Each structure stands twice: as structure tokens, then as C-alpha cells.
Amino acid sequence: IEGHGCAVTWAFGHLVTLQEPGEYDPILKRWSLDTLPFVPDKFQLKLIQNRGVDEQFHIIKALFEQAEEIVCATDAGREGELIFRYILALCNCEDKPIRRLWLNSLTPDAILAAFRDLQDGHNYDSLYAAARCRSESDWIVGLNSTRYYTVRHGRIGGGGDRVLWTI
């Protein structure tokens, strides 16, 4: 949606995620105790594999590249901030000025008030850091423990590749 010198677009959930171990090193495509634990030196991002995601990401990227300033209006909270920052990073637009629209209500008055009170996006860097920490720690614990228990004990669940255990 474009007009009056601005454009509005949207994401739907997480369009961007952390790469899988095998994308860092092909040897990690094979699950083995010899390669555990695996923690990347620097986490890399990728698009979630979905045609709708790919199309929407390219729309967002084109708009970000044209923009002089980007306003983040994702959900007010850690995950909303993470969704925006991961997209911003994958678009290579992290050097662009960003502002934050923080909405606690969707009433017309609340939306107008929030637009009048746009904040510097970097005021929310700590919120992003917390979300990123949660995302990366979930990745480290989840992928390493799943691989460990699957290789060590085989499939113990009801079917597919599910692994069940008590923590």
C-alpha cells in the first residue's frame, strides 16, 4: 500500500529463521555424536521455505531498499522486534534509520497517538538482543539435544522423526 510519500507492507509470522547446521558445513547434514555440540561462530539467517514467504520478502526488500527511513510496526514485544530485525538484516538494510511504532491498542486514537510518538528504533536494541538470545539459545539446545538423543537412543516416539524424552 503506497501513498503520500510512504509505503506500508507486512510480514506474516516469522519469514526469516536461523540456518540449519548442514547449511554451515555439509558434514553436519549427517547426524553424528562426533559433531556435537555444534555452535556456529556467527548465526546466519535464511528465508523460511515457502512460496508466499519468498514473494512477501521480496516486496519488503524492495520497499526497504527504496526507503529513506523504516518504521517498525510489528507486534509490541520481543518476537515482533525479532521478526522485524531478522528481516532488516536479511535485506542488508541495517544501516538505514529505523523508528518504532509501539501499539498497545488498535483503536484509531491509540494508533494516531503512537504515530505522533514514534521512537528511535535503536531504543529497542535490548529487546531485540533478548529475543535474539532466546532464538539462538533455543537453536543450540534444541538442535544439539535432538541430534544427541536421536543418535544415542534412536526413535522412541510414535512416528516420523519425533524424539521424545523427559528433561
Where do the language-model regions lie?
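Intrinsically disordered, low-complexity regulatory segments
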Residues: 1-143, 147, 166
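Charge-patterned, long linear interaction tracts outside catalytic cores
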Residues: 147-167
